[in-house]
């Protein structure tokens, strides 16, 4: 048991502690930035100074610091996060490491992401589930290419809150001039980011603990809050609940003849008993009669809650369908524009079929064209025929089925999809819907009778090839 938990138990008792803990809000955030900017050390300092480290963990860090540490005689707090042997030996982060901690005000899940360019795909994976990005900048080096890359990816993935932590201020003698110079440089770069992003910039030293949990006495020129205070008070609940109601159906719950409910997690917005809803893509309408949870029925539920909805009418709804309010206008299309983050050595190929998973629905899609690829360093675009490993570009997609979807910036769950290689079943990329385009219909007219017959023969005798049913292309 760590010291923070001991103190809260002594103050509140077991029941009081559990009740308070259950009702705390949860913030998921990631640390990102260039190599050796101090991401893992910052997380280690945050855990250490907020009394979230167990005694055996601290003893192990002291022992490992003598062998593979990079901080001399002091404990290397980065070792609290870097768990892989290769990470400890090289002093770098490779995989995304997740850590959990809580304070009296909030619960946190931290994703420590790698800074090397070759591991950009790992960083994008970590950012995809987060609400906030802590972007580290080395005070000696300033804004680097990887700083811009990670800022752009975080922005592309819809993160609306950035905390830019200018780290290693102790190595520039806590210079206010140096901090202001970096601050101005980053704010100038941020003008090119899309959407509305709240940016807070803070000077700190992860190694010394300045402005991490407690305010620094060596930077009295900085009058803002510490990093932990910013994390505790940022308002992310409003972002999720203010959107339109979206409920991707994950499972049809029918334990007996008298109950039929639709289970899933609310992606955005709020639903109440009595609300008029419709199911997509069918368009059938009904009324919500119950909102069922493990702890009992609720009068209303908001984004993030896992619930089962029961309806007044027996309408056909299955896994992958989307439940929205009856008045909602939702695009249903098989033709769209999406930003793609490519995550494998083999480049994205125009015209090749990939499995697509979006909000519980599975279909097949292919890229008709790569509109452009992004230059991460200056956020400009240039012509490209395909996307390489870690490449990011805007692509035109067609799906074999009509899919109800949103723009990614409006709702990540219904606007984001993963791209899967049909032969290896490996996730090769992530797509973020930019806009829907006019449906493509009548695709079967381009196939001859011989092609359709051959396709049917291949699917019958070689099902492991996962060939598309050409006769169904263009059908919903």
Curated annotation (Swiss-Prot):
Swiss-Prot/TrEMBL catalytic activity: sulfate + ATP + H(+) = adenosine 5'-phosphosulfate + diphosphate
Similarity remark: Belongs to the TRAFAC class translation factor GTPase superfamily. Classic translation factor GTPase family. CysN/NodQ subfamily.
Organism: Vibrio cholerae serotype O1 (strain ATCC 39315 / El Tor Inaba N16961)
Keyword terms of this UniProt record: ATP-binding, GTP-binding, Nucleotide-binding, Nucleotidyltransferase, Transferase
Enzyme Commission number(s): 2.7.7.4
Gene: cysN
PROSITE patterns with a match to the protein in the record: G_TR_1, G_TR_2
Name of the protein described by the UniProt record: Sulfate adenylyltransferase subunit 1
Subunit structure: Heterodimer composed of CysD, the smaller subunit, and CysN.
Segments for region (G3): 112-115
Chain's role: With CysD forms the ATP sulfurylase (ATPS) that catalyzes the adenylation of sulfate producing adenosine 5'-phosphosulfate (APS) and diphosphate, the first enzymatic step in sulfur assimilation pathway. APS synthesis involves the formation of a high-energy phosphoric-sulfuric acid anhydride bond driven by GTP hydrolysis by CysN coupled to ATP hydrolysis by CysD.
Organism lineage string: Bacteria, Pseudomonadati, Pseudomonadota, Gammaproteobacteria, Vibrionales
SUPFAM superfamilies assigned to the protein according to its UniProt record, in alphabetical order: EF-Tu/eEF-1alpha/eIF2-gamma C-terminal domain (SSF50465), P-loop containing nucleoside triphosphate hydrolases (SSF52540), Translation proteins (SSF50447)
GO biological process: hydrogen sulfide biosynthetic process; sulfate assimilation; sulfur compound metabolic process
Pathways involved: Sulfur metabolism; hydrogen sulfide biosynthesis; sulfite from sulfate: step 1/3
């Amino acid at each position: 048991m760590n010291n923070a938990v001991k103190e809260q138990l002594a103050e509140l008792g077991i029941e009081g502690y559990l009740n308070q803990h259950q009702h705390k809000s949860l913030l998921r955030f990631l640390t990102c930035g260039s190599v050796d900017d101090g991401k893992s050390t910052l997380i280690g300092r945050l855990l250490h100074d907020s009394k979230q480290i167990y005694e055996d963990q601290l003893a192990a860090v002291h022992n490992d610091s003598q062998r593979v540490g990079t901080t001399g005689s002091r404990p290397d707090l980065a070792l609290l996060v870097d768990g892989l042997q290769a990470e400890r030996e090289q002093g770098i982060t490779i995989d995304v490491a997740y850590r959990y901690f809580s304070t009296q005000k909030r619960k946190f899940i931290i994703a420590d992401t790698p800074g090397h360019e070759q591991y950009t795909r790992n960083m994008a994976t970590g950012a995809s589930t987060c609400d906030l990005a802590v972007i580290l900048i080395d005070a000696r080096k300033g804004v680097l290419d990887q700083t811009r890359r990670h800022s752009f990816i975080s922005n592309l993935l819809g993160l609306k809150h950035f905390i830019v932590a200018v780290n290693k201020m102790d190595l520039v003698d806590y210079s206010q001039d140096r901090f202001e110079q970096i601050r101005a440089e980053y704010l100038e770069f941020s003008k090119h980011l899309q959407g509305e992003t709240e940016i807070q910039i803070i000077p700190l030293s992860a190694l010394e603990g300045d402005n991490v949990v407690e305010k620094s006495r060596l930077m009295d020129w900085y009058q803002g809050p510490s990093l932990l205070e910013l994390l505790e008070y940022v308002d992310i609940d409003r972002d999720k609940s203010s959107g339109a109601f979206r409920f991707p159906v994950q499972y049809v719950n029918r334990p007996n003849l008298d109950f039929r409910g639709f289970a899933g997690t609310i992606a955005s917005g709020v639903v109440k008993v009595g609300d008029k809803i419709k199911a997509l893509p069918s368009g059938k309408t009904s009324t919500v009669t119950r909102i069922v949870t493990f702890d009992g029925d609720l009068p209303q539920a908001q984004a993030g809650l896992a619930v089962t909805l029961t309806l007044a009418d027996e309408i056909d709804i299955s896994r992958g369908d989307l439940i929205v309010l009856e008045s909602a206008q939702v695009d249903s299309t098989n033709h769209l524009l999406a930003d793609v983050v490519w995550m494998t050595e083999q480049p994205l190929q125009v015209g090749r079929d990939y499995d697509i998973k979006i909000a519980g629905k599975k279909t097949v899609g292919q890229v008709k064209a790569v509109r452009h690829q992004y230059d991460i360093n200056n956020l400009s675009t240039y012509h490209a025929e395909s996307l390489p490993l870690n490449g990011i570009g805007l692509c035109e997609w067609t799906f074999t089925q009509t899919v109800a979807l949103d723009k990614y910036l409006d709702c990540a769950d219904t606007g984001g999809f993963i791209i899967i290689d049909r032969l290896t079943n490996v996730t090769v990329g992530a797509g973020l819907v930019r806009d829907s385009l006019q449906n493509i219909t009548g695709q079967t007219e381009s196939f001859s009778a011989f092609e359709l017959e051959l396709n049917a023969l291949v699917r019958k005798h070689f099902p492991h090839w996962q060939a598309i049913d050409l006769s169904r292309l263009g059908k919903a």
